[in-house]
Amino acid sequence: MMKKKTAAGLFGGVIFLLIGGVYVFFKHESGMPESLSIGNTAGLSARQQSLLQQPALPADSEIAKLVVRKAVREMDAYDTQGRLLKTYPVALGFNPVGHKQFEGDGKTPEGRYIINDRNPNSGYHKNLGVSYPNDADRTYAAAQGKSAGGDIKIHGMRNGMGAIGAQHLHRDWTHGCIAVTDGEIDELYALVKPQAEIEILP
């Protein structure tokens, strides 16, 4: 009986350590939400769920401009004629209020930039690069004796964690990037035109 209890205790301890390791990884390494649900839209607002249920855009769509509205955690995609094609719910930097000024401040930039890069082999599924910092950003940071930072992307989930899906929306978790689900970055990666404009509003 004692052996059975000992084995059960050891098994329980292993499970506890595994769960604890996952918790630490999410909290420290990726900044992802601490509590995740398998249900893709569980616990999200009606607005977020509605946006997530939108159909895929036609394969011949062209996205010429993106507008991120930080206050409501949404990103609008417009075609070459200025028509709204789709709105995506997003997560932002872990310290999202205000314009990004320095490396490591956790803020998502504000202002007008372009999509200047794309990476199909990102550590976060795929990504589209945002042209932050611009000259004004670099000049301001340098005047303070600091780096403006950079490497701002629109990206999906950390590789191997795509199943998190829309649950990432429960919390702003990036280091300044704009996060969407893997399916959404697949769509954006395919349809956003090179050098497309991106405007990021407060």
Where are the model-predicted features located?
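Exported/periplasmic cell-wall-interacting domains
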Residues: K5-G9, D117-P202
